[in-house]
Amino acid sequence: MRVALFGGSFDQPHHGHLAIATAAANALRLDSVLFAPAGRQPLKLDGTVTSFEDRLAMVELACLEDSRFAASEIDAPRADGLPNYTVDTLSELERRMPQAKRFNLVGADSFLSLPKWREPARLLELAEWIVVSRP
């Protein structure tokens, strides 16, 4: 199975997100694209105003557009209130889907900030990266 994690605030999900996911799924023969609203992003601690539950519900509706798309709670807010780190999310995806070929789908602007992320070298080991221009 070939699965891509597509994380983001998704406040609100829009056609651009769906177009990016569709293009990646088609180009890379992905079986699944998991849309994962971020719990608490360490590099964007002030930006999200819509609750995680509402953003997840919006993503669930958006994912109805393509059978390869699914909403995922894998990056839900942590019980301890600490920020969510992509390295932890990708590690959890590896734990849940050890046999899958894993990808991480991000915008080019996010990828450029990768050196600021927690454990950037480990991130590159946990998944292949799909880097896209934003529409």
Predicted regions and their residues:
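Nucleotidyltransferase catalytic core that binds NTPs
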Residues: 1-135
